[in-house]
């Protein structure tokens, strides 16, 4: 290839470009797409940097005011707000950049950020192959396309726009989006054998009449093109396509025989699946969906297609192929996740999918039930995605239809194995230290980015299983989301009976999400879709509860209960992660006060967590109660810093301003934030100072104080151990309301079964059965296990074999 040759070709007009980003920007102009919108004036832009400059100049006054409100100090406002002056290493500019990004609305989903680039690279490689052809062939192909386009555009202008009253789109744009939809189907190999056969069987007149007029097949593909281009009008076209598709589905010509009717039925099903797929793309990319679309029971419509297909799949020519079956499976699982309506039909449909060929002519069911026969490094990402989708369904079945699964089948083991598979897809990061600690190695290897939608679904499933296993005080009914349980657990110990469920898989997946949120280059507030926000909200609420209450002895948490958590190496990993994030990674930018904090916390972490020169359990009384000891001060400084970081870097930037949470949930998050800060400082009215033995719950009550409550409390002089964190001026708040705060999209619910009836059911979708209290954590040792105990072929990593 000659130097300087333009190797990136526009998929619309075949114009060549020398750089991929120039081609992508040019293609947006074809579709009229401006994905970046200013939250202040609602003006849209093609490029993010243009919008950032717009906010820093046009909305400068508003930006300065917002910055002053956020920092509480006008003197800290940067003098220059120009784009070229931003110093990414400055803490002030990082805050300003976060504020600017919070004013940007991006019509793209979290998962797309991580896997869209691979699709672009794949398309560019295909285009580079096309460049190798002679220019004469390119000109001939372009000429033929112009002739077909002109003929179709003329026919569409006369017939289609009149038939469907598409007043929001032109005939030219319809063809543009149609081509984008076709390209997407071809590149992703969706029903790849169906469309060549369909188009070859139609003449030009028939193509217009049958494909565009009598049935909205052409419009459905155009709707897919609009969805992937993030066009806001795609929801309007989707509603028109859906109503007309189902209106035409009952119109079979009586002259056709049974075989022709089956062919028409399969044709209808293919385009219905494409239509549902385009809706899923809209939901994942935060494209607003109208109330008229929300009224459709899409999951039931999808199952109405799949149920006869699974019963007589041999009669279907295209849908029965292996590749198409797994595409349909992924579509079905994702719509199930959004609808939460698993029923007997769902069980039947899933039974068909797990009997399909998965690897080496073996069905998926055999691969799962007989134990994975392949190591975690041998599976492709496509295979892992299928397994992750199936694990989510198995989790629902285990709760609702347990008799349908083998008695020895453990969903948790499958989740651990699949998480290990995704971890192995992560490139090995270079070591940043000559002598890294064991915790640093674990974080480097196991805290990963999200690889796909199915990877995020696996993280959700791991979290759902953990919440499902939590035991609340007095057997209180448990909701599936942690934040919905918060009014019940805010004043009680939550984890001391369930600390064994705080395992490495749970913690590393949680910290992976936290790590992505703390990385400003990963995504912004507007890039998070509702499902992302749901899980993030729950994880943040859980960690606020853990670090502000569960790890501090009080009237509700005894020292023995704290010790059960502190002997868990996974809790050590969390403490080390936050120590590394708050202090080590920012070591060059710490203020003088923060450096003093760092020195004390570093000694504590080295002595008790990294080297184990000192024992957390034997020194627990000093850590929890000795107000003047270095260990007490360092421990509480670390907990306070973690809570502050969760609040300032995640809760407020990402959750309080999220459009996907209702006002009640935001109010509860604010209460949780205030409660967490207050809980770290309030005096112990009834503090247990007795035995650390877990066998005794007898408490001798006395009055003590964790940190001074008064905002005017003077720090100790330099000759004594300082209280390095100034006490907060937070008013005591009333107990949090017991109202139930839920999301727009809930977690998996327990479906009322037709028969046999397993338990009493009601209207509350969050009601679940009480779980038997598991055995306590082994106080002597604990392992980071990366595999199930029953699977000898799985990779088993013992991270803390020497912790005693």
From Swiss-Prot:
Cell compartment(s), UniProt: Nucleus
Predominant location category: nucleus
Region Disordered: start-end pairs: 782-804
Compositional bias (Polar residues): 782-796
Superkingdom field: Eukaryota
GO CC term, one of those recorded: chromatin
UniProt keyword Nucleus present: yes
Pfam family, one: zf-C2H2
GO BP field: regulation of transcription by RNA polymerase II
Keyword terms: DNA-binding, Metal-binding, Nucleus, Repeat, Zinc, Zinc-finger
SUPFAM superfamilies: beta-beta-alpha zinc fingers
Zinc finger motifs (C2H2-type), residue ranges: 8-30, 36-59
UniProt GO MF annotations: DNA-binding transcription factor activity, RNA polymerase II-specific; RNA polymerase II cis-regulatory region sequence-specific DNA binding; sequence-specific DNA binding; zinc ion binding
Name of this chain's protein: Zinc finger protein YGR067C
UniProt organism field: Saccharomyces cerevisiae (strain ATCC 204508 / S288c)
């Amino acid at each position: 290839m000659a130097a300087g040759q333009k190797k990136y070709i526009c998929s619309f007009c075949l114009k060549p470009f020398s750089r991929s980003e120039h081609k992508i920007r040019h293609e947006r102009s074809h579709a009229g797409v401006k994905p970046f919108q200013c939250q202040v004036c609602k003006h849209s832009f093609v490029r993010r940097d243009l919008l950032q400059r717009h906010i820093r100049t046009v909305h400068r006054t508003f930006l300065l005011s917002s910055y002053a409100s956020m920092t509480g100090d006008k003197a800290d406002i940067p003098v220059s707000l120009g784009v070229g002056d931003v110093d990414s290493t400055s803490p002030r500019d990082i805050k300003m950049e976060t504020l600017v990004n919070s004013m940007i609305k991006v019509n793209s989903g979290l998962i797309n950020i991580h896997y869209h680039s691979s699709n672009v690279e794949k398309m560019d490689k295909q285009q580079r192959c096309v460049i190798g052809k002679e220019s004469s062939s390119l000109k001939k192909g372009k000429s033929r396309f112009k002739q077909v386009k002109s003929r179709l555009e003329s026919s569409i202008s006369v017939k289609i726009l009149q038939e469907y009253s598409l007043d929001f789109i032109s005939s030219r744009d319809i063809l543009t989006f149609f081509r984008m939809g076709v390209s997407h189907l071809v590149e992703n190999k969706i029903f790849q054998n169906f469309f060549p056969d369909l188009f070859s069987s139609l003449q030009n007149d028939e193509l217009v009449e049958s494909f565009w007029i009598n049935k909205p097949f052409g419009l459905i593909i155009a709707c897919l093109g609009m969805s992937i281009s993030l066009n806001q009008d795609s929801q309007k076209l989707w509603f028109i396509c859906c109503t007309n598709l189902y209106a035409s589905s009952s119109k079979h010509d009586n002259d056709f025989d049974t075989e022709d009717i089956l062919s028409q039925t399969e044709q209808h099903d293919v385009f219905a699946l494409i239509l549902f797929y385009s809706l899923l793309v809209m939901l994942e990319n935060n494209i607003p969906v109208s109330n008229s679309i929300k009224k459709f029971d899409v999951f039931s419509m999808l199952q109405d297609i799949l149920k006869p297909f699974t019963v007589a799949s041999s009669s279907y020519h295209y849908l029965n192929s292996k590749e198409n079956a797994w595409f349909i499976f992924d579509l079905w699982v994702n719509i199930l996740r959004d609808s939460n309506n698993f029923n007997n039909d769902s069980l039947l449909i899933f039974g068909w999918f797990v009997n399909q060929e998965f690897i080496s002519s073996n069905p998926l069911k055999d691969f799962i039930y007989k134990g994975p026969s392949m190591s975690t490094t041998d599976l492709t990402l496509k295979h892992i995605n299928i397994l992750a989708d199936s694990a989510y369904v198995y989790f629902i079945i285990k709760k609702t239809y347990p008799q349908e699964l083998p008695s020895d089948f453990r969903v948790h083991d499958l989740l651990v194995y699949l998480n290990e598979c995704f971890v192995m897809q992560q490139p090995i990061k270079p070591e940043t230290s000559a002598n890294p600690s064991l915790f640093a190695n674990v974080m480097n290897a196991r805290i990963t980015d999200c690889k796909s939608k199915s990877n995020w679904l696996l993280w959700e499933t791991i979290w759902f299983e953990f919440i499902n296993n939590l035991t609340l005080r007095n057997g209180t009914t448990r909701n599936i989301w942690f934040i919905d349980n918060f009014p019940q657990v805010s004043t009680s110990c939550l984890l001391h009976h369930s600390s064994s469920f705080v395992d490495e898989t749970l913690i590393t997946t949680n910290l992976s999400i936290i790590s992505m949120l703390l990385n400003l280059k990963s995504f912004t507030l507007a890039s998070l879709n509702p499902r992302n926000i749901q899980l993030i909200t729950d994880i943040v609420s859980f960690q606020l509860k853990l670090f502000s209450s569960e790890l501090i002895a009080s009237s509700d948490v005894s020292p023995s209960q704290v010790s059960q958590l502190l002997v868990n190496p996974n809790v050590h990993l969390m403490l080390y992660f936050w120590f590394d994030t708050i202090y080590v990674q920012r070591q060059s930018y710490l203020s003088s006060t923060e450096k003093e904090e760092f020195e004390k916390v570093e000694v504590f972490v080295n002595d008790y967590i990294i080297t184990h020169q000192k024992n957390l359990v034997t020194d627990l009384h000093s850590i929890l109660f000795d107000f003047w000891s270095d260990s007490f001060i360092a421990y509480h400084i670390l907990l306070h810093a973690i809570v502050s970081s969760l609040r300032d870097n995640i809760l407020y930037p990402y959750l309080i301003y999220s459009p996907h949470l209702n006002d009640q949930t935001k109010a509860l998050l604010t209460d949780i934030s205030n409660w967490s800060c207050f809980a770290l400082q309030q005096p112990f009215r009834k503090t247990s100072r007795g035995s650390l033995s877990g066998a005794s719950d007898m408490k001798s009550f006395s009055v003590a104080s964790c940190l001074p409550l008064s905002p005017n409390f003077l720090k100790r002089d330099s000759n004594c151990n300082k209280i390095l964190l100034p006490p907060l001026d937070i008013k005591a708040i009333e107990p949090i309301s017991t109202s139930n705060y839920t999301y727009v999209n809930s977690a998996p619910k327990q479906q009322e079964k037709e028969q046999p009836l397993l338990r009493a059911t009601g209207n509350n979708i969050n009601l679940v059965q009480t779980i038997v209290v598991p055995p306590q954590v082994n106080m002597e040792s604990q392992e980071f296990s990366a595999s199930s105990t029953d699977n000898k072929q799985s990779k088993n990593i013992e991270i803390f074999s020497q912790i005693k």
